[in-house]
Amino acid sequence: CVYVVLKSYAAKERQGVVRRLTDRNYWFNRSTAKDYGLMCLNAGLRTSLWLPLIGSQLVGTLVVARALRDYFGFPEPVIWDPVTLTILYTFIYFLVDDFSRFALHAAMHRVPLLWRLHSTHHSATTLTPFTVFRVHPVESGIYFFRAFITFSLVTGVFVWLFGRHLSIIDVVGVNAIGFIANAAFANLRHSHVWVGFGRLEHYFVSPAQHQLHHSIDLCRGNYGSVLSIWDRLAGTLELSGKRRPLTFGLVSQDRIEQSSQPVISAWLSTAGDSKVA
């Protein structure tokens, strides 16, 4: 993904980006050290705690489908073409999942208690593809629970309505597509590589828009993940426009310096007195 973007840059700009990406200090500094530490800790936490605590998404799906069957009974048989059904399921799940990401992200900025958690992510003063993993463990659990709920509800409804016509391949495939799409865009959203989408930013969130979201002075919006229509409806959409110098981190200098705290301290503490963005 980064390679494709670099090919579109002018030669001079491309040299600057390559120089930045190959600079050891870009990847290894006080800010990125916290990225790597939280990435490892959250991975272990999710495996050892969140999965056993919340359960798998497929189990949640079966619980929802059975609850609908017990309450409403068996629906009238609906036979759809498998391809059409797969497209419909993928589209609806994508919309619900993307909106839930937007709503939770906006809440993380608007609700002071949640901002205390989310400010850990925004304390990064250097953005790299690993910054996406710079998340307070409690926030990581909240987002994991969000994914569990949205997947279980949407898939449970489809299983109840269409039963065996919705195959396990469709269900797993949607998760795989979502994972690949997020991985492809995340490495540009959390970087210093400026990529705007022009007029398409009214509909899709560009990496440049998310970089504005991380800047200290320029933006208090762009909460969307893939679709920017939610920001447009909420009045929080900010277009990238021309490239400009950006400063990343938190408004309060002492909060910016928290990125140099030991990872364990950051894992247990929150940025309580930082300003809600």
Q: What are these model-derived regions, one by one?
A:
Residues 170, 244-277:
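A membrane-cytosol interface segment of integral membrane proteins
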Residues 1-71, 89-101:
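Specific transmembrane helices
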Residues 15, 57, 209-211, 253, ...:
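Residue-identity detector for glutamine
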Residues 39, 233, 266-270:
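Residues that form generic nucleotide/phosphate-binding pockets
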Residues 16-20, 27, 31, 78, ...:
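Coil-to-alpha-helix initiation sites in intrinsically disordered, low-complexity, charged segments
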Residues 41-53, 60-65, 76-247:
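Membrane-embedded catalytic scaffold of the fatty acid hydroxylase/desaturase
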